[in-house]
Amino acid sequence: MLGGSSWLSLLALASYTAPGEAATLFAGGTVIAWDPSAQRLDVLRNGSVLVENDSIAAVFSGPYNGTLPPTLEVVDATNDIISTGFIDTHRHSWQTAFKTLGSNTTLLRYFERYGTHSPASTVFTPEDVYIGQLVGMLEALDGGVTTIVDFSHCTWSAAHSRAALDATLESGVRTEWAYNFGDYKNFTFDAQAHLFQDLVADARFRNSSTRLGISYDCFSTADPNRTRTILDLARWASLPSPRARNPQLTQTIAKPTYPS
């Protein structure tokens, strides 16, 4: 994370990989680095970070001993702090439109006013979801968050779901985009399952920092057959699973037959 006016360059770096031999040197800042030999943080005064294409090529303090690329953009990071990006493990980016409204709200009121079954489900259009998701992702980058587990419970229809995914992919944020299976009046569970299969086949994931996941809150309350189907889908799609750490989910599940 980079403070001061230089954050714009770092934001561009995090969200866009330029073609060719692009190189950027963030010079003269305070770098919060990592010492692998001592297994601890290493704070470098007058430190610099050299980035080539989409990778960190060097982290150093003082003059650079190597050869700098001939085409180099230098960003003055004096009086700024440079660190790795933060990780947000639970975010609902589509809810950006509600920001500042729920600061004095109980959990029950939150569910009623702003949650997946709130009036938002009937008022928000797919375009509203897209804008909220994209702005929320870019806001995260602005705050130094570069990796997000996005609990996307705005999946009220196929159009809403695709809008949220489109914005996530466009943002460039490294994201575990967790598609939510919910109890929605106008979007049946079977329709949600078929859409998920379509999303698994989306070619945009192959060259993206976004990875598909599943969010599901009803393991203990929903129809067991529905829960089994969701676990089957997760296994079919080779998604990361909590089963290894949750004894309640370690039962053997037959491999389902779904379209390849």
Each language-model region and where it sits:
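N-terminal metal-binding scaffold of metallo-dependent hydrolase/deaminase domains
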Residues: W7-P69, D80
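Catalytic pocket of metal/acid-base enzymes, prominently hydrolases
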Residues: S93-S118, L134-V149, A159-D183, A234, ...
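Active-site gating loops and adjacent loop-to-helix segments of metal-dependent hydrolytic enzymes
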Residues: A97-V129, N186, P247-S260
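Metal-coordinating catalytic core of metallo-dependent amide/deamination hydrolases
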Residues: A159-S260
